[in-house]
């Protein structure tokens, strides 16, 4: 048996030598807290995540890395390289919603296909409910995964679900776990029930292992985005995971999640391609900790769907043996949007941002997009110690600009004062004069609530910081005028339902 595995490794290694472009394995959790990884919490949570930690230990991890405030926004920022306000993908997608990636926006997958990559996405998508929004219509050769957050998936199992309303069931019930191919083949493999949730990530993992094997066997570089459903609520822990952490059902599932990451890393080793594979680990947004104990945790202020660091700042790490120095800790500002230009540069296309701005054909289709991301390859590979990103914009899911970070300073224009689940229900409070935080001296944004002399400090510091933030915003708005929002942010309520009638009457009066 050992001889067989040795020969198999040699065969795969030989095939891998036929391609020079790096493979790309992107591993994401869902709502993973910054503090839920032992590389960050240093054992304080009472369990370990050795496989995720391995990526950090063998590469670089970030301290000032930004996702977005919720699922759809974070995922769109990564795969499109654009600010969610530009694509209109700020709101969490729901069953039946006309919300998803528009055909005018190019994806990272399409760009990499142009570079000879085979592409696949396995696991949670959350970038559109309809067939037109499926990943296989946006650059992916294969998709196998679910389309929404877990609590939406299990709604039909609720005894009060209006299953007798045929129209509602037809239009707004969650679709099952979809397997689709770029040739148009779409198969619904069945609903994501509470029972299936216990092990569905293992289904996605097996598909990922098979895809990598096939890609290496073909001698082609691969781009694989593996999106687990863990650790979104409601957590349904597998029977064989119970007790793994000694810290309750949620952390048991977290350990199980880490074990699946380990299987992916081990498979790269077995295929002989680990040294030529970029592995990145992260999550979409900050934790949803108002559902504790079925929730993640972070040292940063508040949680997802707020303006605070806890809603946006997420764990992130990347490994590329021989290219990224082991054991690095990077304090530069980076965000999900930055991976499109960074990974394209790694694939040999360093000017993709300029190409797309001018207009270019990708995978046989014309695109003209503004990428909001920056190429971090020089920083990651040690050619510079200064990152290209100098600012970050905190957009709410309603499309409100709540804050701007420039350098170490954060100016807050609107704050979420609600606690617990009310952060989803209550409006942001717009401030007549903004709050100010220094995210090096006060990374957890405690000063306005805990410091006796905050207002005195504020008066001395805020005027130039507001000016700098306004200048940064003006630069962004100039690009937004040239490349305007693709669609209006969606709503959870009914406020937009009357707009077509108002607009119709307005047109008649003109």
Residue spans for each PLM region:
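Sec-dependent signal peptide recognition
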Residues: 1-7
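N-terminal signal peptide c-region/cleavage motif recognized by signal peptidases
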Residues: 13-15
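Formylglycine-dependent sulfatase
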Residues: 2, 17-430, 434, 443-445, ...
